[in-house]
């Protein structure tokens, strides 16, 4: 069963933890790719200098952040990569959760082809570990791009999160990655990951 709007309608820090262990589903050419969410980061526009919406900043690019909970916010970085976020709390609040890493579960060969243009069995150990262990890596592997920006995970048939009951794990809370510019916000312990999971991007 997919997660509903009510599930997403909560503080981004709470949602970021509760998404761990849930399963992201992405349909590509009629094939469903599945991956367990193992690492997330929370962003809260009102108080978070690392957020694209800090201080109420509102542009065409950041408009999805102000959307309904459960909306996808997909943005472009470094001129070639995408990052995938899910909006939380309440419409107009500009809170969201970055999906940082997945553990591949189903149709791993297609995931591998999308990521490396190779069958999974052809990958070396380094490639296998890095197949979905980072926000842009998982977007490549699950074919998530600007076409998915604004997509409603509560209604979409091709991108959503399943309420699968994987909860036998310990959650690590630590600092977020790549936000040294964000002054005091760089020290917020708003990154969450499943302890000892091999697909976490940074430990």
UniProtKB/Swiss-Prot annotation:
List the CDD domains: AAG
Q: Which Gene3D superfamilies does the protein's record reference? A: Methylpurine-DNA glycosylase (MPG)
Source organism of the structure: Clostridium botulinum (strain Hall / ATCC 3502 / NCTC 13319 / Type A)
Q: Which NCBIfam families match?
A: 3mg, PRK00802.1-1
Q: Which InterPro entries match?
A: Formyl_transferase-like_C_sf, MPG, MPG_sf
- An example Pfam family from this entry, by short name, is Pur_DNA_glyco
Name the enzyme's class.
hydrolase
| Protein name from the UniProt record | Putative 3-methyladenine DNA glycosylase
Q: Which protein family is it in?
A: Belongs to the DNA glycosylase MPG family.
């Amino acid at each position: 069963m997919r997660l509903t709007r009510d599930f997403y309608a909560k503080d981004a820090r709470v949602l970021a933890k509760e998404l761990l262990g849930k399963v992201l589903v992405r349909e590509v050419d009629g094939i469903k790719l599945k991956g367990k969410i193992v690492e997330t980061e929370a962003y809260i526009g009102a108080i978070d200098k690392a957020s694209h919406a800090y201080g109420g900043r509102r542009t065409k690019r950041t408009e999805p952040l102000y959307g309904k909970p459960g909306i996808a916010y997909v943005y472009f970085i470094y001129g070639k990569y995408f990052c995938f976020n899910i909006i939380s709390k309440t419409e107009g609040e500009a809170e969201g959760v970055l999906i940082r890493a997945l553990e591949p579960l189903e149709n791993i060969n297609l995931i591998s082809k999308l990521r490396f243009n190779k069958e999974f069995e052809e990958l070396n150990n380094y490639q296998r570990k890095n197949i979905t262990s980072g926000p842009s890596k998982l977007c490549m592997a699950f074919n998530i791009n600007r076409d998915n920006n604004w997509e409603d995970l509560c209604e979409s048939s091709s991108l959503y999160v399943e309420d699968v009951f994987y909860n036998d794990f310990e959650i690590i809370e630590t600092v977020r990655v790549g936000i040294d510019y964000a002054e005091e916000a760089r020290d917020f312990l708003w990154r969450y990951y499943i302890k000892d999971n091999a697909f976490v991007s940074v430990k």
